[in-house]
Design a protein with these regions (language model features):
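"A position-specific structural signal for the A-helix of alpha-solenoid helical repeats
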Residues: 22, 67, 103, 110, ...
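TPR repeat positional signature
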Residues: 13, 20, 27, 44, ...
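Residues that mark the junctions of alpha-helical repeat units in TPR/alpha-solenoid scaffolds
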Residues: 9, 16, 40-41, 61, ...
Length: 160
């Protein structure tokens, strides 16, 4: 975006949500994050969620909660990861008509991962199975592939 471009408040929120979302993923994908990288990643995820809550509707809010859950899980903060994962599922459940078929499997995956980070293998496996079953219902092949890739990645603390 050019520096001199004028945006409405809504457009600015959308712009920053997208920007911070991308910056969060850049750091999530970075193999050798420093403690400062981890803090910036967390800050970016919170900023992205804040902007999505203003400009993105239920779908983006749900996905922002999912992303924040993933960041907390990567940082080993299971209780916070679980809180945001459960919010992701609650938003999905309250807005099913607005969601895509990949949103439910991702919400289950976030809960499973949060339980894994928290050391609760039983609940992690339960939600992992739910995520896998829900993932089978994803109709768009690219979305299904993305979900399965995310499901396979990351640290599952021995659950998988």
């Amino acid at each position: 975006m050019p520096e001199d471009q004028t945006l409405t408040i809504s457009q600015a929120h959308y712009h920053f949500a997208v920007d911070y979302h991308g910056k969060t993923w850049e750091l999530l994908d970075k193999p050798d994050r420093t403690p400062d990288d981890n803090q910036r990643m967390l800050d970016y995820a919170h900023a992205s969620l804040a902007h999505w809550r203003t400009a993105g509707g239920a779908v983006r809010h749900q996905r922002g909660e999912w992303l924040l859950s993933r960041v907390y899980a990567v940082l080993g903060l299971g209780a916070l990861a679980l809180d945001h994962a459960q919010r992701s599922l609650e938003i999905h459940e309250g807005n099913k008509a607005d969601m895509e078929d990949s949103d439910l499997p991702f919400a289950y995956e976030a809960i499973a991962r949060a339980y894994a980070v928290s050391g609760n293998a039983v609940e992690s496996k339960r939600f992992l199975d739910m995520a896998k079953r829900a993932g089978e219902a994803i109709l768009v092949p690219e979305d299904k592939d993305l979900f399965l890739k995310e499901l396979q990645g990351g640290n599952w603390n021995g659950v998988k």
